[in-house]
Amino acid sequence: NTPNEYERTLAVLKKTMDLQSAAVDEDFNPCELNDEELYELMRNVADDFGIVNPFPDKERFYDIYRTLKNFEDVTWTDIIEYGDRRFKFRIPEALIDEMEKNFIEGFQEVLIPEAEKFSPCLERLVEAHGDSHFMLTTMDNFYYKILNEMFSDNEMVDVKQTSIYEYEFTSEKFDLILAVPIFGVRDKADEQSTFICREYDMIAAENLALHLKSEGILSIVLPAKITFGGGRVKELREFLQSMYCIKEIAELPSGIFENTAVKAYLLTITTGRTDEVTIKRYVTNTKNPRKDGIGRLVVQDDTFVLEDELTDMGDWNVDRIFESQDEDWIRFQESNVKKQELGTVASIFRGKAVSHKDPTGNIGVVNISNIGEYEIDYSSLDHLEEEERKVTNYLLKDGDLLIPARGTAIRVAIFKEQIYPCIASSNVIVIRAIDESLSITYLKLFFDSPLGRKMLITRQQGTAVMNISYKELNNIEIPLPSVEEQKQIADTYTREFEVYKKTIQEAESRWSSVLAELQERI
């Protein structure tokens, strides 16, 4: 967060008013500063805050100062909160309430980095746990001054201007760390960084864990990438699991933060001992948290896995953990039906990125919006002008199964060959049977089933918007009965679907006729 001009100006005015209220004469009696003394005091305060004089016009300063004196006291928390919330990252109070549950009775050394994000709950936290000693950090000089003012009379609070994205930001260790680091930004640490990852959120997780005391707890919010990412992110997961104990992994609801759609998780990491890892999925008690706010977080699903089991999984996929304990999944695993990984009977690939559209182009492009619940809408395809040989590897074939890779809903439809060549856009996944051992119609029916839909959902790479990895689909284990049984199922589906469409068309036609007759009588 970066303080805005209004925050800075309010801070200068408040500090000036506080100093004026505390002013005394030679006999230590309260005294009123004259206008010149007051203006000079304001300039000194601005300089102390590292701010350019916000009132070069003296008369404007006097007018605003006198006006503010007639209002209720402005608090330092009010100043941090002031400004357009769209440009301020704030942690919802409901989330802070969950993080606060890690406090224990008695004295603790507590670290809250980038503490300005925790307003307006910061003062409440410190007051509620008055037996503990708090270190509050911030990277910003202005917020450093504000936090010092906020807790100037509290000996149990120290404020430090430092960065948790640098080694040895402090030499101290803590019993409890509550952190919501920078995430959802493209900036990374330079390549000379000695941390495992270059992303700032991942750096924070590694660095803060190093500052835990024995039996210490780190409660940290991280983007979903920590649960599934490969490469260095996977190395970080392995580091955390080998050096510490993962106590809890909790999926946070989409839209919990006002100014980012990044899917996030609340992780609880400890230097203590634990054999079980609690797995949770939170929802909000309001339907639309962005519009209605969040009263509290409610646990929708709750289970656990053994720490060794989590290590063997290779990732922290919460959906997959719940799937493995789902009744439909257990029945499927225990059934005698033949099971096969999808990648062994089908080829799976992403469509092609299309940068230039041409309404009169020779090649049709199937986008997510064209994929319906049952069929593809060919009437509204985009088109591309391109030599067919240049898109040969992407040309769709009759019977290909198309699934949106991104979006808000999972739909599965079978491509029917058109009189012109077609390709899928890059946001569409194509599944093509390698041979006759797999019926694509049967596969569509399976993916439309509750179990099949759950399997697709667990292959999402956690973001607020659906994002399915086509590579992950290779590993989905599907029921694969005999070719004859698949054909019987597919034939019945196709036949009855045609009856369904005809029935709908006849009903719509009849309804239109009835409406027309009734309207003529009006």
Q: For each of these PLM feature ranges, what is it?
A:
Residues 5-84:
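Long recognition/docking surfaces used for binding and targeting
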Residues 82-179, 184-186, 223-224:
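Conserved S-adenosyl-L-methionine
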Residues 197-268:
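Conserved Class I SAM-dependent methyltransferase catalytic core
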Residues 259-338:
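Flexible, glycine-/basic-rich loop-and-beta segments that form/coincide
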Residues 267, 421-429, 461-487:
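A short glycine-rich beta-alpha junction/loop motif
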Residues 304-358, 482-522:
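Non-catalytic DNA-recognition/assembly elements of restriction-modification systems
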Residues 340-354, 369-398:
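Sequence-specific dsDNA recognition surfaces
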Residues 392-394, 401-447:
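A short beta-sheet element
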